[in-house]
Amino acid sequence: GLNVFAEPVRQGDLTLVVESQGEVRPRREIIVAPQISGRISYVSPDFIDGGFINKGQLLVRVEAADYELAVVRAQSTVASAQQALALEEAEAELALQDIEDLGISDASPLARREPQLAGARAALESARAQLKDAQLALDRTAVYAPFAGRVRERNVDIGQVVSVGQSLGQIFANDVVEVALPLKDAEMGRLGLPLAFSSSKAQPGPDVTFRATVGGVEREWHGQVVR
């Protein structure tokens, strides 16, 4: 006869392994560029191809003399505008006193020196705005690293004249990297991932283990599918 064997079903965890390979890319990579023009007066010794940099580290400085002079001029303009406003306020006060003493009830705005006072106030606001612009330009003579990471390449040196937006080099963050892993439809199904998957706190992606040989040494990193 036919022998039939039965095995009780046991509930347990099953690990499905899908293998793939891809290129490691930094999540953040930017071109370092100045927001003002001028001659380079300083370059950090760490700002070299392959160099390590810290967040907030000074990478490059543009000669600041012209921008410092612009700030001094703007400060002088503000001081002059403040003095002019103070004089105009005094003149307006005297004009109002004269109008009151003469008993004039329908004095014109010009007689009350209202246009002159408004003009002096506007001149002061304009001078303050110019000072703010000059100070901002001076601050921008220093170019800092927005994050910690490494330098992919440097395109500038001391003495070089640069313009606004010119590439000084490229840096990338090394805290988080991304790897694009090509998967077949069947492999996506084994992982239980829809085609438009995007991880969230409620639905995190599956864990990923990366292995690579670096300098003859087998290394391993752990990550997670995010999209």
Language model features: what each stretch is:
Residues 23, 51-55, 137, 142-190, ...:
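Surface-exposed patches in structured soluble domains
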Residues 1-45, 130-132, 145, 155, ...:
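N-terminal beta-strand block that forms a small beta-sandwich/beta-barrel module immediately after a flexible targeting
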Residues 72-83, 181-188, 225-226:
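Short, compositionally biased
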Residues 17, 176, 183-227:
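Beta-strand/loop subdomains of soluble extracytoplasmic proteins
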Residues 63-73, 175-180, 219-220:
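Short, Lys/Arg- and Gly-enriched loop/turn segments at beta-strand edges
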Residues 16-19, 76, 80-84, 88, ...:
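Extended amphipathic alpha-helical segments
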Residues 58, 64-65, 167, 173, ...:
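Short, surface-exposed secondary-structure boundary micro-motifs
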Residues 60, 67, 74, 99, ...:
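Amphipathic alpha-helical coiled-coil segments and their boundaries
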